[in-house]
Structure formats: structure tokens, C-alpha cells
């Protein structure tokens, strides 16, 4: 059944791929620059450019904060990538990353009303990336880091947050973590379990898996174990990077070892940001009753929803729009930046992330919650405003 699905899915992907390639050629890029002001006369020209433009320049020179009043800075984000970890394509470089970053800019505008520009850097050197972003930051109200490989992404984000006084947000980490937590909050209501009592397995110890684990712990989960392709991660695991070593101080506190199958025995929640088809029905059967599974590998999840349900799972989410419970970052990052920009936040804090997750979860009315309805729709017009208000309420 799984093999048949994969074959059907690959045929669908081929059809989508052909259409996407054709349309991208027709569009010749997905975004454009549209002026807000008209330049139809000499007077228009004199105000929009010289000599009139000198006046706001002088005001900003006297106080840099006035750039928020007189320029696009107040509602503009840089979408920065080095092309080192793009979707499932891997390290494809700056030019090849452009269609993804353009797409991200489209989503910022369509879902959050935020202007965004793709900035694809022809370097994968940590120091060069940091220096470049610092140097271009005056033009932007926020920095969205995208598709930068781990563990470099952790250092790049951390140092940029220290160096800049505008929000810096690695969406592959935190956007994913926020939507996962929001889904789990609602899934727990469906299965009538408490976070403190749940055993959680996160499979995939890269940027997304680590950020998910951190946010789950901050929310109040006590028993979280990280796994990767080698199995359960513990303090004795070999070849851990520096961030994974840090995570061993707060996860798998009993020092358990073994395979993913071993980890899932008696687990209540599985979150997969890993590889297709690696969770079997037998593994799901070994989990606790009414298990929650978020199988988010794309385009083929760790286990298909129907197989997971057949094996006893109660709530199943994926990253895809053709199954119930799509766990998609688009319900998070536009509203998060909208709120951060409108509130002139200097950083996006852990409190803001938790508030965003709770706000997203709250968009599904409790009377409408069920095993196939735990997430708001990406096209729900309330999402960005509700998330932005939650973020603004937590700016200090």
C-alpha cells in the first residue's frame, strides 16, 4: 500500500512540477516592486526624489529611529538564505534557492501584509553571512533566516540576535516549532491527556527537531526524547554536534538507548521531521492508547495517516494540504512578523513564540475540535491578525 501510494504521489508531483516550471517561466519571478507614490509631473519628481527627498534624509540622520516613519523599514523583512538546506533538495546554492525565497516573500505579503525581499547569499561561511546581514540590516525591520543548514543556523541566528536591534527569526526552527506546539495543544484536548503525563518522541535532530523540542519543554512537557537516523540520542551518542550535546542535558533524562522502534514503545506523541516511511504500523501499535502522530516529512510522511489510524493512532497531522490537520508554518510566520514590526519589537522572544502557538490553537473553537480538525486553515483570514496581536501583547 505504501509503495503504491508513493508511486501515485510521484505521478502527482510530476504533474505539479511541470505546471510549476511552466508558470515560473511565465511569471519570470513571483514578486515585483510597485511604487506607492505617483511620479507624473516635475512636482511629483521633486518631492519623491531630489530636492524634496533631502528633508526626510536629514530627519533620519538626526535620529535613525525615524526611518520607521519615513521609509519602508517599518513593514519590510529580508528573507535571507545561503541555499545550503533548501526543502528536500539539500545544498543547491544561492541562485537555485531564489524561487523558494521569492515564494516566501509572496506568503509574507499575501498572509500578513508584510513586504519581503529575497536575499540569497553566495557564501556559506558563517562569519561572512553574519557580516553581510549586519551590513544590510538598516534597510529592514526584521530578518527571516531561511534554509540554512544545521548546526550553522543556530550560531548565525544567535549572534545576529545579539548584534542587531531588529527581530531575527529562523523560520525553519521556530515557525515549525510554533505550529507543531499549537497542533499538539489541541490534539491533547481531543485525546484528553495532560502534557505533564505524556512521553514525546521527536525524530529528526536538525534545526526543526531541536527547536520543536525546546518549545515543547518550555511549554511544560517533561519527558521528551530526540532521535535521528542512528536511533535514540543520549549523552553517550557519537558524532553529536554542539547543539545536540546541549539538548542531551534536557532530553532523554533516563539515558535510554536503542532504535526509533524502541523509543516509540509506550510513547504518547510522535513528531517526525525526518524521512519518508520510517514509522511502521507495528511501531504505532506499540505506542500508548490514543497516540498523537505528526508525520511531517515531505512530500511523503514518516507514515501515511490511514496506516497510522489503522494501527491505533487517534490524531494524525502531516505537512500536506491533501490530508486533515496540515501543520504548516504559513499560519505562524506572517502574523509573527506582522506583530513584531507593528510593535517595533527588538527581538522575537520565547514568550512571543508561546503566545503565537496558543493563539493559533485558539482559532479552532473547542466545540469544533475533533481528531481531524486541530489546526486552523491557512486561508482563515483571522490567523495573521490574531497571531500578531498575541505577539504584540508580549513585547516588553
Predicted features and spans:
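Short, Lys/Arg-enriched N-terminal segments with co-localized hydrophobic residues
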Residues: 1-13
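N-terminal ligand-binding/catalytic initiation module
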Residues: 11-166, 388, 394
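Short glycine/serine/threonine-rich phosphate/pyrophosphate-binding segments
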Residues: 87-89, 153, 176-181, 203-214, ...
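Glycine-rich phosphate/diphosphate-binding loop of Rossmann-like nucleotide-binding domains
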Residues: 92-109, 178-271
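General beta-strand structural signal in soluble alpha/beta enzymes
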Residues: 118, 144-147, 168-171, 202, ...
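Adenosine-phosphate binding glycine-rich loop
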Residues: 171, 295-396
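Rossmann-like adenosine-cofactor binding region
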Residues: 245-314, 320-322
